[in-house]
Swiss-Prot record:
An accessory protein needed during the final step in the assembly of 30S ribosomal subunit, possibly for assembly of the head region. Essential for efficient processing of 16S rRNA. May be needed both before and after RbfA during the maturation of 16S rRNA. It has affinity for free ribosomal 30S subunits but not for 70S ribosomes. GO terms for biological process: ribosomal small subunit biogenesis; rRNA processing. One of its GO terms (cellular component) is ribosome. Binds ribosomal protein uS19. Belongs to the RimM family. It comes from Aliivibrio salmonicida (strain LFI1238) (Vibrio salmonicida (strain LFI1238)). It is found in: Cytoplasm. InterPro entries: PRC_barrel-like_sf (IPR011033), PRC_RimM (IPR056792), RimM (IPR011961), RimM_N (IPR002676), RimM_N_sf (IPR036976), Transl_B-barrel_sf (IPR009000). The gene is rimM. This is Ribosome maturation factor RimM.
Amino acid sequence: MSKQDEVIVVGKFGASYGIRGWLKVVSFTDQPESIFDYKPLLIKVKDEWVEFSVESWKRHKGLVCKLEGLEVREEAQAYTNLEIAVKADALPELSEDEFYWRELFGMEVVTSQGYGLGIVDDIFETGSNDVLVVKANLKDAFGKKERLIPFIDEQVIKVIDREAQRIEVDWDPGF
């Protein structure tokens, strides 16, 4: 799938809000309200992504929005739990040393000495830095099934090679 065709889920609709067709919005973006900055927004209807327009949005114990064409609560209820997405090419371009998490999933992780630690399976945030969840190779010499590696640039993460789909780390394979 080319970047032009790829869609990225950036949120989802929650329950309807009020009687005039408004919906609660759960945003997955760093700044929750920035979900409304992306154009066009897409929703998945019957296994197909379709564009929609936000008529208005506001903060009210979170985010709520009104979609164009929805006038009553019953119409809005049909959108509950639908995912909100954008086309990947609508996301801002990053510099060479910046990455979207989605780019790191599936990359091979190796130590500076060439030992294969496994594949990036997940990433999560902590208070100080992000952490790579690396699913270990089946025949890992250290008997590890999973490793948690802090994403600390230059100190732990040495090189990220997009072309080779490889991350080089300064990490003890026994840990």
